[in-house]
Amino acid sequence: MSITADAVKIFATGFELFKKFGIKAVTMEQISSACGISKKTLYKFVSNKPDFLFQSFSFFAQRMEGILYEVLEKNGGNAIDDLFAIERFAEKHMRGDEDRLIGQLEQYYPELAPRLKKKREELVFKITQDNLRKGMKEGLYRQDIAVDHITILYYGHILATHENNIAERPANLDELRQTSLRYHIRGIASDKGIQYLNQIINNEEWEN
């Protein structure tokens, strides 16, 4: 999605308003006022509030993808390093507010929720597949893994750690997610990758 600088400002402002006040409470008048434009000008970018919601959430996903890949490039780590960096990034930037807003969408705009969940799924699939191919190239992941299948399974892990209706939900979700991540890595790693993962774990235990 390629958008203009004006659209970036508008969608970013709107998304911050949704995070602060909630989806239902924010009106198009408030968005236009916060952006310093008229409501008529705002409607040059979108057709209605549901359209604005979809565009602003799509913008947020695109922005997070760009920032994440910049972080990974700056870190210069291998595929396993990247997985831990992705987990930290998601915890800091994407969980909490996004999950809460998706819940509000399901309640107030149920027709939008599946489309935006699909956007999130596509983003996770792309990041996961890129990571799998990088790890295979580096020799850290096994060469016989089925990228498409592993992507689906890993996405299932992510959803499982976000569900609110799990009967025996652990008190520490961070530990659950770390366990899930290590489980994922052990399932796809080569001997070289397992050795590297163990180094990370041992270093963490030593630091603690």
Where are the regions that the model predicts?
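Generic hydrophobic, amphipathic alpha-helix propensity
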Residues: 5-15, 31, 56-60, 64, ...
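Hydrophobic alpha-helical bundle segments that form small-molecule/ligand-binding pockets
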Residues: 123-150, 157, 161-165, 169
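Hydrophobic alpha-helical connector segments
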Residues: 55, 69-96, 154
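C-terminal peripheral helix-coil segments that are non-catalytic and often amphipathic
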Residues: 130-134, 138, 167-208
